[in-house]
Amino acid sequence: MEKLFSWESKKKGDGREIKSSVEEVGALLANELKEADKEIPLFIMGYSYSCYIAYDICKRFEQENIPIQGIIMIGGTPPTLRDDLMQFFSNDDNALLDYSRAKDLLNEELIATLSDEEKHEYLHELRMNTVAMVNYKFLDCKLKTPLCSIVGREDEPTIRNNQHLWNNYFQKVSFHQLPGGHVLITKYHAELAKLIMNYIELHV
């Protein structure tokens, strides 16, 4: 038996309060997940910025001795590379979009549907997420929960080639690469789903 819990960033027009830090979102979701059936194996998954939220939830659960079967990070930026990410998002909107198109870093299908104002809001949120990542404090010790790290073969070399740095934050890490860039979740979702299901089946 399986249950899926998901969290989506605030969108234009919804009335939710914006959470400005990884810790705020992690605390909110951790409290919700504690209400889940304890008999159901729990896996935490994050993409890009949400990888840090997944880590924060996992950290909180380990501190309270609540078991998690595994954590899955897709396109996660290791903590020591956060300044590089901040440098990228310090560009103006047009420069950021041009660079993204060349590197397949952002969701171009979504961006194409947005007005100029909505594009600015979208990029502003990405910048705020990046600031939240830079400000987040990781533990000095390694988490016990096994990590499955997944990146695209065409992702930013700085991210793709430094996934081994997650070994500094988890006792056990398995590394995987799939076709595509940073947004492989939109173009290679079938391959991604197969890899994730295989990982889950190995850890239940």
Regions found by a protein language model. Give the residues of each.
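Active-site catalytic motif of lipid deacylating hydrolases and related acyltransferases
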Residues: M1-L42, P79-T80, D84-Y99, L178-H182, ...
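Short beta-strand immediately N-terminal to the catalytic nucleophile in serine-hydrolase-like folds
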Residues: I44-G46, I74
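Aromatic-acidic/polar surface patches that form glycan- and anion
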Residues: V22, G46-Y47, K119, I185
